[in-house]
Structures are given as C-alpha cells and as structure tokens.
Amino acid sequence: MDKVYEPHAIEQRWYQHWEASGFFAPVGEGAPYCIMIPPPNVTGSLHMGHAFQDTVMDVLIRYHRMKGDRTLWQAGTDHAGIATQMVVERQLAGVGQTRHDLGREAFIERVWQWKETSGGTITRQLRRMGASLDWSRERFTLDEGLSRAVREVFVRLYEEGLIYRGKRLVNWDPVLHTAVSDLEVISEEEQGHLWHMRYPLADGSGHLVVATTRPETMLGDTAVAVHPEDERYRHLIGHSVRLPLTGREIPVIGDTYVDPEFGSGCVKITPAHDFNDYAIGVRHALPMISIFDQGAAILPRADIPAKYHGLDRYEARDLVVHDLNELGLIEKIEEHRLMVPRGDRTGVVVEPFLTDQWFVKAGPLAGPAIKAVEEGRIRFVPENWSNTYYQWMYNIQDWCISRQIWWGHRIPAWYDGEGRVYVGRSEEEVRAKHGLDASIPLRQDEDVLDTWFSSALWPFSTLGWPERKPELDTFYPTSVLVTGFDIIFFWVARMIMMGLKFMGDVPFREVYIHGLVRDAEGQKMSKSKGNVLDPIDLIDGISLEDLVAKRTQGLMQPQMAARIEKRTRQDFPEGIPSYGTDALRFTFASLASTGRDIRFDLKRVEGCRNFCNKLWNAARYVLMNTEGQDCGSGGGACSYSLPDRWIRSRFQAAVGTVTEAMGQYRFDLAAQALYEFVWNEYCDWYLELAKVVLQSGNEAERRGTRQTLAGVLESLLRLAHPFMPFITEEIWTRVAPLTGAFAPTIMRQSYPEADPALADPEAEREMAWVMEVILGVRRIRAEMNLAPARPLPVLLSHGTGQDRVWSARSGPLLEKLARLESLNWLAPGQAEPEAAIALVGELRVLIPMRGLIDKEAELTRLDKEIQRLDKELPRLEGKLGDASFLSKAPPAVVEKEKARLADLQAGLASLVAQKERIQAL
C-alpha cells in the first residue's frame, strides 16, 4: 500500500472496475430489495441535496447487497420539461432565434441533440459519488417504454372519467406562457403596499372600502364580499356597488371566508385572478372575468376602458391608482409586507390565470392512497411526516397536468374540425376506434404533460409496465423511497395514487424523509447568498480564485457579486482542499439524523478525511506486521491475548450497534459506532496493545495477535464498506487473503453479523481496568507537565484482590502504554509518599512527585496561565452579557462564544486545582 492515502488514485479505478464487472446488477436468490432513484433532471448537475440523498440510498443498497438480498437500485433521469426547454431556448436566444422560428419538430430535435451531448453530467457525477446504480437498466422519462406507459395511463384514466379538460384557475408564468406547478412557485415575503379603495353603492347612499395589494385586478372584480354575521354590512347583502373606472354594477355577497377583523371587513372578489376568490366565485356562481392575456397585459375587453388595453399589469396598476386618486376613491395607502409568488425558473411574479387545461380528478385516487398509509402498508420515517401527507391528501385539489411547452409527453388527444376531442394511444387507434377515415383532418393537442405525471409512474414504468415483465413481479412494490419533504405531495403521494390504481399495490413499503442540507450557520444554500457548495469541489478541491468565479457567475442579481466574493474570500482563504469521495460520504452519513435539516460544516469533512487517513495508516501497520508471516491459517497453535479477546468482543458490539442503527435509518448512529470502534478502540488502543504482544509474547500469542489484527480489520472493512466504498475495497483486496478470503470485490462479501460466542464480558471488564489505569497515569503526566517519554515509577494501594490479579497479568501492557519505570504494590500498612493520585474504583494509583518536577518553576508557570485566563474571562463574560451582541450576532456565533467561555472556565478550574496539588507536595 502507498504510504499516503490519495483517494483520487483509487476511486475512479475501482468504480470503472465495479461497473465493467456488472457488480451493480441484482444477483442471487435472496429477498428482493429495490430503491428507485428520484430521477434527477437530465440537464442538471449534482448539488449537495443530491449528494446527500444519493449517499443515503447507496449506503442502503450496498448494505442490503452484502446482506444477501437481490438488490436493485434503479437508475434513470427525468426529462424536466420546463427546465430543459429553457436551456435550449436560451441557446437559441443567443443567436437571435426563438423556438417558433424553428417550429415544433425541429425544436424538439434540437433538444434531443442537446440532451445527448450535454445530458450526461449528472450521471457522471453520480458515479463520482460511488453510487452503485444498475446502469445497465438506466431509464429516461421520455424513452419509448416510459412514453408507452404514460399514454396507457392517460387513456385509461380518461376512459374512466378521471381525466378531463376544463377551464380552471392555475399558476401561470407570463414569461414562459405556461401553467406551472406549485413546486415551481417560490413565495417570499416582500415589501409592498395595501391600497384602500372606495366602491360607491349603486343607490348612491355611500360607499364600501376594500383593501388590496393588487389594485389593477379591480378591473375584473365581480363582487364585494362581507361576513354574513357582520352587523355593519349585513343589511347590504344583495345590494350592489358600482365598480369604479368600468361602471359595472357588482353584487355585495355574504361569505364566511371574509375576516371581519381584517381591514374594513369588505373584500373585493376577482374570481379569475385569485385562488381564494375563485373558490368564492364558484360557490356564488359569479362571472369569471379574465383581464390579462398570456403575457399578463390587459386584454382589449369591451367592459374595460380602452386606455388600459395592452398595458403591462404593473403599468396598469400605476394608471388605475392614479385614476382612482383623481376620482377621490383612494381612502389611504399603507406600507405592507406580503408573500409574492415567483416562478423559480424566470423569477417573474406568477399570475393566477383562468385557462383551458387538462386535469386529473384527484379525489377518487386519494381515498385509497390515504387508506394505504393509515393501514400501515406504507410507513413514513420519521412517522410525523405522515401527518403532512394526510393534510395534503384530505385537502387535495384536481391536478392540472397540461403544460404549454413543447418538450415532454405530448397529450394523446386529437381534435376534429368541430372541436370534438378524441383520446387514444395513437392517431391510428383514434381513427379506428371512432371510425374516422383519412379524409377527416385531426389535430393533436399542442400541450405536453406535467413532468410529475410521468414521474408518478416511475416505480412501475421503469420495470416494464404495461408489459408484465419478470422484474416487475420481482421488484414491485419497491422497498423504500428516499426523498425530501418538499415533494411528499408532488411526487410521493402521486406515486402512491398511481401505483395503487394501476398495480393494485403500494409502490414502496417505507418512505425515508430527509432534511435540507444547509450551510454551517443553518442558512439555506442558494446562489444569491453565495453559500452554495458543489460536492464535486469537495471531492476534487478548488482554488480560491476558481471558487470566487464560480460563485459570482450567472447571478440573477449581479450587484450581489461583490458581497459574495468578500464572504467567499473570508470563509475559504485557501480555497477548498481535496477531501475525496469517502470522506464526503462518511460526513453525510454522520449528519443523517432522521427528519432534521443538516448543518454542513467543512470541519466535519476534514474530520472524516482524517478518519480515512487513520484507517489507511492502521491498515499499513497491520500489513507490515502480517503479510508474509504466520497468521494462523497454516494450522499452527493460536493463543489469544487479553487485547485480542477484548477487540473481538468489542467488534461484536459495534456490529450490533451498526446493524440496529441501519434498521432504524439512523445512519448517524451507525457512522458514530464505526468511528468510535475504528478510531478509539481498534487504532488508539488495540494496535498499541498488539505491539506489546508482538514484541514480547510467545509464538502462539504472536500468531493469535496477527490473526486478530488481520481478521478484525477485514471484518471492519466489510462493516464500513456501505459508507466508504473506495477505501474499504482498496484495503480489503490486500487484507482479505491474510484471512483466507479470495473474491473479486468486497461488494459481494457478506455483511458482518454479531457472533455471541465471541462476546467476552470478562475481557472487556479487565481491559476497561487496564485502560483506566493507563489513562490515570497519562492524565497526571499531562497535569504535571511531565515529558511523555519519561518513565514514571507507579505505586498501587488499597486495591481489591481482583486488582492484584489484573495488575500481575497485565503488567507488561501497563508498563509499555503508560511508560512506567516500575509498577509495585505498597505493603499493607505502608504509608503513602507525597504523590499525585488517580482513582480506579477502590484502587489508588500513585506517582511519587519527589524529584520528578521543579516545584517552584511549575508553580510560576501555572500562575502565569491563571493570570492570563483571569484577564480573558471578564472580557468574554461582558460580551455575552451585552444585549446588543446577543440580538445582532448569528445564533451560531453566540453559541460558539458560550462554548468558549465554558472551556475557559473549566480550564481555569483545572489550573487552580493543579496548583493546589503541587503546593501540597
């Protein structure tokens, strides 16, 4: 093995070997275990959320593969309709063209070309993460098999009356000119205004005051609503007001939706441009007056004054407010904070828009999906997310599935010259079914399906449905879905509905919901904040200048660049070092506590990189002491020392902890157990203890220790493999032959199982005693500032009979690891000398101080340290007592200062105690 651990030297080589050898494919006769990857956008690149989620899935897949399950991790990508189309449209815009200049067929061909040349970025990056997906089965949501499934589902749902075309209110992006899903709308609080407007009563007896954040929409008002129990207005219900600027009379209606306490208690109702107003409009059969075209400009309607025709909505707002003010109909204008919905792709304000769209009737599909979770056929982890699921499902609305773009699954519906609609799997089927010969022209619907429609079929369409292929029977239902909370409704619920409808069973047994990956301060990562980390940069490293350039390019708000550059230079003065994939994966696992958002700190990755180094160096030590030597496989007698029996026993405990944690999706606890065993027990203790046996034991003991060194290392590599696949494979291929294991890959080895026969409570008790004595001596050495290499005389007193047995048996271990000059028991009744003392139960461990330290020099040194801390403490206490600091500083900074104060206080107390001990000598 190389002297230094270099992850890049091994990662790419091993991944290519695994993939070329077909090791990711399902094998064996074990129980099926299947995970469907949430298909990433084919045009996208890996972000921290992907990297975290894919690590969790790969840990599960590798774990179950080694458990002997017939394991499939289904690979695939999503066509990502709007996102992909926008990329290609931007390319066309760069040469002064639009998609309409090319025409539909040529544009779609252009998108396919771009997908083939540029669409493999994210799958290459998944490989860099070590993701053991079965690439031989990779699917794409627009490939022919999945497209056939989409058409089949659409036709069946339409024939059952569960898909229909109708005019309803949708989220409309006026730049893209298409409906968008709620998930593609980002609502953030912004500063705006609240306009209070007077609507005159039609009988001239006065006016009502309504408040709105969107005065331009008053051109489409069709009512004023009041609460039916509001004494101020109850007598006006059924009367009319005259809508300013238009002259239309609109009714005053009573509806319990109105909050009498908000504003004047009167609400303008614009059913065609507000979702709440739409519901009121439906309840009261109000007219739906659309005032905007697809680009959010005022329509040239006869009931809207011509001066507003063609104006952009914000130009119309200014003119409407001006005209109302001129008429004395503005009561007041207030500053107001409001939630503004913007398209996540374009950044423009999304408009509630009344338009003809295709819808799925969701109610009949939701009932069985709710029941499946209630009956426990699907379990959410953590359980509390089932409440979110129920909340959405009980309030489900019909699903708008049509999009006014070109890239996607075209809706399988055709129209004749009279506007009659025919739905079928193909135009040929439609003509045959309805007796329409070639002389009757048919026009296919221009719209495509919402990307989530094909994604909802992912668990069974990827396995060959509607054909009944063997893999469909084997792997459906899948085992677990790993996903974020933000798409429980958009994807999870819809997969459940479609799976139950078309497969007659749930699509997965469990849903593991993970949190968001945030930065070290708990802030959401976003390009505008300049705090985005690229997982590939953490693997490969990136220079400061390249990182600054990366973070400041392509900003929607270029003025943020200077601030982002300043922060980046402050946070990463040396850029980001290369950590390697295994360190990043182990970091993600150690942070994967169920249901919580993840605070991602590079210090954690650095710690995990150090963990990889520790494992690498431990393996080098083991190989240097075992390769070419007798490790017990030749039949020679083996005698197992106390450290051998102890580490074997501790390994059984570690296996039990990791296995239990994996069953509970507590990857953080599994990673913690691995870390503690490898670092604290195997490396820090056992390897040091083994040196003593190898140097002084008899041949049978040395043989037993060599066997244990190699055997435990081989087993812990298998235990750690799902988390750290590359380094474990590299080391395992060298170590495995020493244990008699010969195989092409660790991936196909069995996962360790705890062996009760190797549990040795007696060895653990004795080793705990040995470790306490050693630590006690080391603690005194540190407190008294005694050189680590200086051998110390140790006396023991007041111990039990068991202490005497253990000290006699483990004397060589104590002398070597505690660096003792001598180890003796005081005779019964013999007075204890002036000494520093460590207590181990009843046992007193004494280090006589006479002649070991310069008492006066040590007291002088301690006084200086105490004085330094005495000056530092009041300054820090004052800072934490400053209300201004506490209110303005980020919570993470405050907590850091509190922790520093606690450390200083503990350090001062320790120094004072040490001074008192030395003064007493």
Swiss-Prot record:
EC number: 6.1.1.9
Coarse class of the protein's main subcellular location: cytoplasm
Motif 'KMSKS' region mapped to chain: 524-528
Pfam families membership: Anticodon_1, tRNA-synt_1, Val_tRNA-synt_C
Entries under InterPro entries matching the protein: aa-tRNA-synth_I_CS (IPR001412), aa-tRNA-synth_Ia (IPR002300), Anticodon_Ia_Val (IPR033705), M/V/L/I-tRNA-synth_anticd-bd (IPR013155), Rossmann-like_a/b/a_fold (IPR014729), tRNA-bd_arm (IPR010978), tRNAsynth_Ia_anticodon-bd (IPR009080), Val-tRNA_synth_C_sf (IPR037118)
Xref: PANTHER family: VALINE--TRNA LIGASE, CHLOROPLASTIC_MITOCHONDRIAL 2, VALYL-TRNA SYNTHETASES
PROSITE patterns for the chain: AA_TRNA_LIGASE_I (PS00178)
Gene3D superfamilies assigned: HUPs, Isoleucyl-tRNA Synthetase, Domain 1, Valyl-tRNA synthetase, C-terminal domain, Valyl/Leucyl/Isoleucyl-tRNA synthetase, editing domain
One Gene Ontology term of the molecular function aspect: ATP binding
Top-level taxonomic group: Bacteria
Record's subunit section: Monomer.
Coiled-coil boundaries: 849-920
Subcellular location: Cytoplasm
Positions of ATP binding: K527
Enzyme class: ligase
Gene Ontology biological-process entries: valyl-tRNA aminoacylation
Family (UniProt): Belongs to the class-I aminoacyl-tRNA synthetase family. ValS type 1 subfamily.
Gene Ontology CC: one annotated term: cytosol
Gene name tied to this protein: valS
Protein's name according to its UniProt entry: Valine--tRNA ligase
Domain comment, as recorded: ValRS has two distinct active sites: one for aminoacylation and one for editing. The misactivated threonine is translocated from the active site to the editing site. The C-terminal coiled-coil domain is crucial for aminoacylation activity.
Described purpose of this protein according to its UniProt entry: Catalyzes the attachment of valine to tRNA(Val). As ValRS can inadvertently accommodate and process structurally similar amino acids such as threonine, to avoid such errors, it has a 'posttransfer' editing activity that hydrolyzes mischarged Thr-tRNA(Val) in a tRNA-dependent manner.
Keywords noted in UniProt: Aminoacyl-tRNA synthetase, ATP-binding, Coiled coil, Cytoplasm, Ligase, Nucleotide-binding, Protein biosynthesis
UniProt KW Iron-sulfur keyword: no
Lineage: Bacteria, Pseudomonadati, Pseudomonadota, Gammaproteobacteria, Methylococcales
Segments carrying motif 'HIGH' region: 40-50
Species for this entry: Methylococcus capsulatus (strain ATCC 33009 / NCIMB 11132 / Bath)
Catalytic activity from the UniProt record: tRNA(Val) + L-valine + ATP = L-valyl-tRNA(Val) + AMP + diphosphate
